[in-house]
Curated annotation (Swiss-Prot):
Heme 3 binds at C133, C136, H137. Heme 4 binds at C165, C168, H169. This is Putative tetraheme cytochrome-c type. Heme 1 binds at C44, C47, M50, D95. It comes from Allochromatium vinosum (strain ATCC 17899 / DSM 180 / NBRC 103801 / NCIMB 10441 / D). The lineage of its organism: Bacteria, Pseudomonadati, Pseudomonadota, Gammaproteobacteria, Chromatiales.
Length: 184
């Protein structure tokens, strides 16, 4: 191989490496931008079928409370850790698909599937030991002496049994759907 050919190959390799590096940075930035954008309350409520959920959420303590801390859609529905977060984002793409395809594009169609959809969320939360709930609420951080007798008793028993939050707190931010007659 001539000196010129070797020099050209080296320049090409460095250019290719540089482009891959820049491409990697752009890719990571785009993924980060996409995650941050789709984690906003504005994005989550941009589909008109989510307006019912949004109105219910606005009635909950997760939206307005004495502490002034507001939990948004992503706080409850999107894991903080990168791996589970990416999986959740990929799985959530099906919701956009169903909105676009017309499966849940009206409040009536959404309500017809609400029990099924709620159960998907509940099963995911149970499987993760209510990971998203525990990012704000954790037995270890609870001051049981400040809770009502009933809450203190229930939280203490739930902790002893190793229960997860969602086992008792379904319908905490959205109305709990009623089980349809034909659900199994």
């Amino acid at each position: 191989m001539s000196k010129h050919a070797a020099s050209s190959a080296k320049r090409f390799s460095l250019l290719a490496l540089g482009l891959m590096f820049v491409g990697g940075i752009v890719f990571v930035w785009a993924v980060d931008f996409g995650i941050k954008t789709t984690n906003t309350l504005e994005f989550c409520t941009s589909c008109h079928t989510m307006q019912t959920n949004f109105e219910e959420y606005k009635e909950s303590l997760h939206y307005k409370n004495t502490s002034g801390v507001q939990a948004t859609c992503a706080d409850c529905h999107v894991p903080k850790e990168l791996g589970p977060k990416l999986v959740t984002k990929i799985v959530a793409a099906k919701d956009v698909y169903h909105e676009v395809m017309g499966t849940i594009d009206t409040p009536e169609k959404f309500e017809a599937r609400r029990w099924y959809l709620a159960n998907l969320v509940w099963k995911r939360l149970e499987a993760s030991d209510s990971r998203e709930c525990r990012s704000c609420h954790d037995y270890a951080d609870m001051d049981l002496s400040e809770q009502s007798r009933s809450a203190r008793s229930r939280h203490s028993a739930a902790q002893d049994k190793g229960q997860t939050c969602i086992e008792c707190h379904k319908g905490v931010a959205h109305h709990e759907p009623t089980e349809p007659d034909d659900a199994s």
